[in-house]
Amino acid sequence: MIRTSLCLLLAFGLAGSAFAAGNDDLDIDKVNGSIHVPDNSTVGKLSTVNGGIRIGANSHATSADTVNGGIDLDNGATIDSLETVNGGIRVGENNKVAKTVEAVNGSITLHSGTEVGGHVSNVNGAIKLEAAHVGGGLETSSGDIVVGANSRVEGGLRVNADHSWFHMSSRKPRIVIGPHATVAGTLEFKRDVELYVSDSATIGKVEGANPQKFNGDQP
């Protein structure tokens, strides 16, 4: 089995050669502990329960998911999907995520030149785009959203009603659409928010909020 083989490789200090072989069937599955994929590597599915995941620059993985831990995707890496329950997700520059980026309790940051084919979503935590492109929309319940300068979002933006028992804050999520950014599709708000839109940004129909215009870099 692949997992057994990987354990033997690790035991003999040969994991680096396994990564270098470029085997996209090489799955890594752990319960306790972090996963680090070196630069310029090709692997399959990455999964851990208690630990973070880091994927090196210019590497490729099929997917990465963790329960308690963050995920870092270094510059130039590619992957199908990223998912965590308790932890943040940071996607570096010029990365490609074919499908989705999802968190429950954690922030999500997409840096310059990154492209996500599907949606980007969380429940609690900020979502920030820095000159990035998202093809399947943005969604949160309690987090702030910043669609930074020169970012593009297709599929709209949605802030859901917060029905969680433990979340008692009356703070309104802050939504900022930055200079020369584009959000195509409906901006739908199921709870009160503060919505700020640059006078050079382009957005679709707004439901449930009153946009406040601003000029300059930030409101």
Tell where the protein language model's regions lie, with residue ranges.
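Intrinsically disordered, low-complexity terminal regions
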Residues: 1-219
